[in-house]
From Swiss-Prot:
The species this protein was found in: Metallosphaera sedula (strain ATCC 51363 / DSM 5348 / JCM 9185 / NBRC 15509 / TH2)
Subunit relationships: Part of the 50S ribosomal subunit. Forms a cluster with proteins L3 and L14.
Family membership: Belongs to the eukaryotic ribosomal protein eL24 family.
Protein name per its UniProtKB record: Large ribosomal subunit protein eL24
Listed NCBIfam families: PRK14891.1-1
Organism taxonomic ancestry: Archaea, Thermoproteota, Thermoprotei, Sulfolobales, Sulfolobaceae
Domain of life: Archaea
MF (Gene Ontology): rRNA binding; structural constituent of ribosome; zinc ion binding
Length: 61
């Protein structure tokens, strides 16, 4: 059975056998569809609701 995931930052679908998984020290698993999403969340600490290219932006606006 193939499991599909959603990106933890932008909310986009991640096709099977792609994407990156990040495990925090507390055991939380974060899935990212691209290096861009990973950097924006972990390195730059951006809010996904303020970026136009994320799905959470369209839900808020």
């Amino acid at each position: 059975m193939v499991v599909s995931h959603k990106c933890s930052f932008c909310g986009g679908d991640i096709p099977p056998a792609t994407g990156m998984m990040h495990v925090r020290n507390d055991g939380t698993i974060l899935w990212f569809c691209s290096n861009k999403c990973r950097k924006y969340m972990l390195k730059y600490h951006k809010d996904a609701k303020k970026l136009k290219w994320t799905t959470s932006y369209s839900r808020v606006r």
